[in-house]
A protein has these predicted regions:
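Active-site neighborhood of phospho(di)ester-bond hydrolases with catalytic His/Asp-centered motifs
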Residues: 5-7, 26-32, 50-55, 76-79, ...
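Binuclear metal-dependent phosphoesterase catalytic core
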Residues: 2, 71, 104-106, 111-128
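Binuclear metal-dependent hydrolase catalytic cores centered on His/Asp/Glu-rich metal-binding motifs
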Residues: 12-15, 36-37, 71-73, 78-89, ...
Length: 128
């Protein structure tokens, strides 16, 4: 399974993003979408879209965090990195800082794809 992880789009849908997301089975947006209408562009790409609410988001229907299990691996999606991780999660995916992150702390992998626009633009493939 290929999962495209993005964050901090801040009302933007970068023109190169569709090519970077091509082939993804799912798209996980880690918050700061800002205008919910921006998600329509992501929804038209086809794969299921999962989103969490960021500090710049006001949409009441988006959760602050989301637990997902894929291929036996438990992921915690959130915007602002949490100080405590509930037991059972192999990875915490977050945005907010606009700084790429890929590190392991106490057996938990911490990932941040960074902002999805400007020089920090990136979409990363995550494998379980």
């Amino acid at each position: 399974m290929r999962i495209a992880v993005i964050s901090d789009t801040h009302d933007r849908f970068p023109p190169l993003l569709p090519d970077r997301l091509k082939g993804a089975d799912e798209i996980w947006h880690l918050g700061d979408v800002c205008d919910p209408m921006t998600l329509e562009a992501f929804a038209h790409l086809g794969p299921p879209l999962f989103v969490v609410r960021g500090n710049c988001d006001v949409h009441p229907g988006w959760p602050e965090s989301r637990a997902l299990e894929r291929e036996g691996v438990n992921f915690l999606l959130t915007h602002v990195p949490t100080s405590r991780v509930p037991p059972g999660f192999a990875a915490v995916l977050h945005g907010h800082t606009h700084v790429p992150r890929d590190e392991e702390i106490n057996g938990v992998r911490w990932l941040n794809p960074a902002a999805s626009h400007g020089r920090a633009a990136r979409a990363r493939r995550l494998r379980g």
